[in-house]
Amino acid sequence: MKTTTEMQLVPISKLVPYVNNARTHSPEQITKLCSSLQEFGFINPAIIDRDFNVIVGHGRILAAKEEDIQEVPCVFANHLTEAQKKAYIIANNRMAMDAGWDEEFLRVEIESLQGTDFDSLLYPYHFTRYS
C-alpha cells in the first residue's frame, strides 16, 4: 500500500479533466458546490497525476471555475498505473453512492445548527426535512 503525501496549490488552468469520466454533475449540484466553496473554502483537495490529469474532484473543480478560483489544492497520486486511475475514478464515485445516513445523528446535528450563521441553503433537503 502506498500513501500519497504530496499536495500543492495548482492553477486550475493546468488541470485536465478525465475525458471519459462517467460521473455527471448537474447544474444544481454545481450550484450547491459553489455554495459550499463560499461557506467553507476549498478544503477537500482534488486528486491528480503528475501530468495534471484529474482523477478525483471534477465537480469541485467545475464549481471553483464558476467561483473564479484560480488555484485549488491537489494531491498527487503519481504511483497509480493508467488502469488503477480508471478503476479509482469509478470506485471513488461508487463508494460515495453506497454510503448511507444515520437518520437520528443527522437530525441531531441539523437541529444543533438551527439559529447559527450556517447557510441552510447549502443542503435544503436535509434542513427542510428535519426543521
Q: Could you tell me what each predicted segment is?
A:
Residues M1-S131:
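Aromatic/glycine/proline-enriched transmembrane-helix motif characteristic
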